[in-house]
């Protein structure tokens, strides 16, 4: 009986300690205080499948930009405005980054990750990933998944 009590007490202390440590670590993330970001991605990679084999191409010609505002890391929300207008997104603050996830009813998933920089920095490294697939087959054409990843920087708004 004593061993069961010790085990329960140990588990409770471990869970409480993990919860406190987690809260403290994200509180120290400077991205927790940012309410808006302007992001620019000058480099991107496209993934394709040719004859069933994965292939990638890296390109630098296209400039892709987006704005993220109404960021609330406590409620886990934000708004991304890019080429298709404003979209409500899920925001997830971690120890070393801030993720924004956009999901559509058609199955598209876009994820933007902003990485922590030095204390006091206003510019942050960022990656924007797009994942889309609409299965379709018509004579002479079969659709393939559309995936890409953009690399660039985000600057904190004022």
Feature annotation, model-predicted:
Residues 134-158:
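Edge beta-strand at a domain terminus
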Residues 33-77, 109-114:
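Short, solvent-exposed loop/hinge segments that bridge or flank secondary-structure elements
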Residues 95-140:
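Surface-exposed, polar helix/loop patches in the mature regions of secreted/periplasmic/lumenal proteins
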Residues 23-33:
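Cleaved targeting-peptide boundary
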Residues 1-8:
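Bacterial N-terminal signal peptides that target proteins for export
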């Amino acid at each position: 009986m004593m061993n069961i009590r010790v085990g329960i007490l140990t588990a409770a202390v471990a869970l409480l300690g993990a919860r406190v440590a987690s809260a403290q670590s994200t509180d120290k993330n400077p991205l927790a205080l940012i309410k808006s970001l302007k992001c620019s991605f000058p480099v991107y990679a496209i993934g394709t499948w040719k004859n069933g084999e994965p292939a990638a191409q890296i390109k630098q010609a296209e400039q892709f930009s987006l704005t993220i505002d109404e960021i609330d890391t406590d409620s886990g929300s934000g708004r991304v405005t890019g080429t298709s207008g404003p979209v409500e997104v899920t925001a997830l603050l971690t120890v070393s980054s801030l993720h924004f996830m956009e999901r559509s009813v058609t199955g598209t998933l876009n994820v933007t990750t902003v990485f922590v920089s030095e204390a006091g920095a206003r510019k942050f490294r960022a990656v924007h990933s797009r994942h889309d697939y609409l299965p379709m087959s018509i004579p002479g054409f079969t659709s393939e998944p559309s995936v890409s990843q953009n690399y660039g920087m985000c600057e904190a708004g004022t």
